[in-house]
Amino acid sequence: MADSVPKAEGFQPQDWFPHNPDAHGTDGPLHIEPAPVYPIADCFFESFQDKGLPYRPDMFSSGETANGCGHAMRSTFKGSRTTAADYITKDQQRSNVTIMCDVTVDKVIIERGPNNSLRATGVEYLDNSGKRYKAKANYEVLLAGGTYNSPSMLLRSGIGPRQDLEKLNIPVYVDLPGVGKNLQDHQLIFTYYEVNKPGLTDDERVSHDPDAWANGLKEWQEKKSGWLATFPFGAFGFARLSDRLDRDVPEWRNMEREEGRDPMGLTDAQPNCEFFHTVCYGGPPEYTDFPKPGEFALAMCVFLCGQRSRGYVTIKSTDPFEPPFADPCYLSDKRDLLMLSEGVRWANEVVTEGKGTRDVISGSWPRGATHHRKKTNEDWHEHVKKYASTSYHPGGTCKLGQDDDPLAVVDKYLRVRGVKGLRVVDCSIMPLLMSGHTQMPAYGIAEKAAEYIMQHNKHRSAGKHKGSAGFQQGARL
């Protein structure tokens, strides 16, 4: 994966940012740049360093440390966000790719061949009126529906746990117990604090001005600048916290662990939590208590890495328009609660004791809240249970694994077990969610899949090759 991710990146260096050129790609379609630094971010960088996180500007691209602070990259350049759409539009547009919008894939078409072998030959999909169509695959079908929809499509296709399929009267093609299992998601918690000094946050532009949104949108539309064109977060950090738990929490200290790993299963080279802060008030879950003119607030955010809780995704019916049912089973493993609580505890120490922030933070927000006074790991448990939520980083539900892994759905080439001509290409294939954000790994998975497909098809002449997933709209059924 390390050689695949940079292929997606078109890094845009900035004079102020000391980047590591070996950690970035320059020719990819995604325009990537470091986020600009707000005044409040300088305060947090000082506090992070005061609390033991060395400053490593490009650490989130280089992967050089699990204990440091630096700058996050963003897929925004000159005020515009770049996305996967840039692979198939603009300079990357290709004549052999047909994009169909406002359609919903129901299932993969599977046909039996010699010796009862199975092959994916296309998909069935519906338009918004419910009319059903077929698309034929010349070579392969690639599912890229994401962690929730890829397993749903497999289940409706008859690929998944036999008992789940039979409950819905879906003919079973392949009994794959792991489809929809192993759901993981980084839990994220926003904890709010009051800032007592004007000019550090962006609240004047965001909360205080009743016309802020209209003016911000107008500025962005006309100039691609302003607060809607930038990144609402500041300094970022990674930290190892297991030693703190060993010191202060007997339950953690007595937990089983493999040699060289903490109870989360992580080594010293892997962070336990990520930390960052907003540059104004805002964030889940309530979107209330916005500061009035003369008031300023922000959130300190803690993001759990290496979570041990596992959930699942399934379908309740064969209706492709019915959303899948997902239960992430957050905090079902006690280790997650202890570690996330420790992350929030340490973050609170950064905010209230760190050299750069202690004099500009008045206490908790909204006024009257007292969470800034919490001291022990246990003190934070109820806060974490109440406020921890999703970071929208799901993965794992079409797990990649060895043949002897009963929950493996795809092999190392991303091919679905038991069916030829079918791959899954998205974050659902991750056996373990990485200790970081999923955006660039998702592109890396796609780049790696492209390599596999080209290797598989290299014997075909370029003149006859029509694309590994050359879907063509078929007749209405």
Label each residue range with its predicted role.
Residues 96-193, 197-198, 298-356, 381-477:
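C-terminal structured subdomain/cap of oxidoreductase catalytic cores
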Residues 5-18, 114, 122, 248-264:
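Intrinsically disordered, low-complexity domain-flanking/linker segments in eukaryotic proteins
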Residues 10-16, 58-63, 84, 198, ...:
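Short coil/turn segments at secondary-structure boundaries
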Residues 37, 41-42, 80-84, 158, ...:
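A structural signal for well-ordered alpha-helical scaffolds and beta->alpha junctions
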Residues 21-29, 64-70, 164-166, 319-325, ...:
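Surface-exposed beta-strand-to-loop junctions
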Residues 25, 34, 151, 161-291, ...:
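Mid-to-C-terminal "cap/lid" subdomains and adjacent gly/pro-rich loops that border
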Residues 1-111, 119-120, 191-194, 202, ...:
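Conserved redox-cofactor binding core of oxidoreductases
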Residues 285-305:
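Structured beta-strand/loop patches that form or line metal/cofactor-binding pockets in enzymes
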